[in-house]
Amino acid sequence: MRNFFFLLFALAFVFGGSNARSATEHAQLMVSQSELDQPTRWNVADKRLLRANDGTNAAEEERGMADIATKMKTWTQSLKTHVGSSKPFQIAAQKWRNTKVQRMIKKGISDTALFENKVTPDEFFKALRLKPGLKQSSVTNNPALNKYRAYKSFYESKIKTAAT
């Protein structure tokens, strides 16, 4: 930790010293009068040199920041689509959705609220942690399976009424 602070201090000293030295050198730069064809001398550090010449066209000047901004925007969009389509991200999103549905079921939220949260019967089945073989079986005394069947019939009736 002490070495880190020493390194940080040394870097700040080196870069701070070079910036102070370059600022004094920059302030002393002068453009000769013969190059300017003007009766007065002016200091380079006092004025902006962008569009200093009347012959430059503002529309033709290249702006580097706009180009960098568009490149960064396309890079972030491609990164976002790549990360969103990656398998680990999708698995994490499915686990998060499953735990969210489990919490809703434990709270005893109504079927209407589950439907409004776009919970599908398959998500409901997974959240109840039922075995896939139970889905097709005729076990009637399993309360979780009965709850699933009730939600599935409710969901299908809502989908039919929404379609008409």
From Swiss-Prot:
Swiss-Prot/TrEMBL keywords: Host cell membrane, Host membrane, Host nucleus, Membrane, Secreted, Signal, Virulence
Function: Effector that is involved in host plant infection. Contributes to virulence during the early infection stage, by inhibiting plant defense responses induced by both PAMP-triggered immunity (PTI) and effector-triggered immunity (ETI).
Coiled coil feature spans: none
Domain of life per record: Eukaryota
Signal sequence, start to end: 1-20
Protein name per the record: RxLR effector protein PexRD49
Induction note: Expression is induced during host plant infection.
Motif RxLR-dEER in this chain: 48-63
Lineage, top ranks: Eukaryota, Sar, Stramenopiles, Oomycota, Peronosporales
Subcellular location: Secreted; Host cell membrane; Host nucleus; Host nucleus, Host nucleolus
The family this protein is said to belong to: Belongs to the RxLR effector family.
Gene Ontology CC terms, in alphabetical order: extracellular region; host cell nucleolus; host cell plasma membrane; membrane
Entry's free-text remark on domains: The RxLR-dEER motif acts to carry the protein into the host cell cytoplasm through binding to cell surface phosphatidylinositol-3-phosphate.
Keyword Secreted among UniProt keywords: yes
